[in-house]
């Protein structure tokens, strides 16, 4: 018979009711080769995300703000563009928005485009280590500015007692407010 080492109790939702709540969902995208196994895993992932969000909304309150990286539009136009960026995630966002949430733009278009361009450049091999190092430093600096901008936009729009949903890559480096 195994011995129980300890028990971690789930905290009640009560203390969080009047605080800002941000649910973070790592974005997973369709595999490039449309492999059946990969698609099945992806479907299961998004189904579990929907289930967890529904459960958390019942305890913590309705999601009022939806934030998605790489998205530069709000409303119906934002949802349509999201279908191109993240087809699986867009279905979730559509349901949440139909229940009253708003899509909030968190990206600065110039910083987003700069980071995407630099990322493409860094995929190429370089003859000069100096050029590679300079581009890497530029890219990291741009990412730092981009993530700081995302953090400030969330901080501006998510008010006390509200819940928001952030869909972002799992390797993000956004630093959130301490509350």
Identify the function of each model-found stretch.
Residues 1-179:
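Compositional signal for N-terminal targeting/processing segments
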């Amino acid at each position: 018979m195994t011995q129980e080492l300890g028990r971690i109790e789930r905290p009640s939702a009560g203390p969080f009711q009047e605080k800002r709540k941000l649910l973070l969902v790592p974005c997973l995208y369709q595999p490039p080769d449309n492999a059946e196994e990969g698609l099945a895993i992806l479907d299961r992932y998004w189904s579990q995300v929907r289930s967890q969000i529904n459960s958390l909304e019942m305890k913590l309150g309705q999601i009022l703000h939806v934030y998605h990286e790489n998205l530069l539009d709000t409303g119906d136009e934002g949802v349509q563009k999201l279908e191109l960026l993240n087809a699986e995630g867009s279905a979730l966002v559509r349901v949440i928005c139909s229940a009253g949430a708003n899509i909030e733009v968190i990206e600065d278009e110039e910083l987003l485009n700069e980071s995407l361009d630099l990322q493409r450049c860094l995929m190429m091999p370089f003859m000069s280590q100096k050029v590679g190092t300079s581009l890497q430093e530029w890219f990291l600096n741009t990412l730092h500015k981009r993530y700081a901008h995302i953090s400030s936009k969330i901080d501006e729009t998510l008010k006390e007692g509200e819940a928001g949903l952030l869909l972002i890559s799992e390797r993000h480096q956004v630093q959130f407010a301490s509350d």
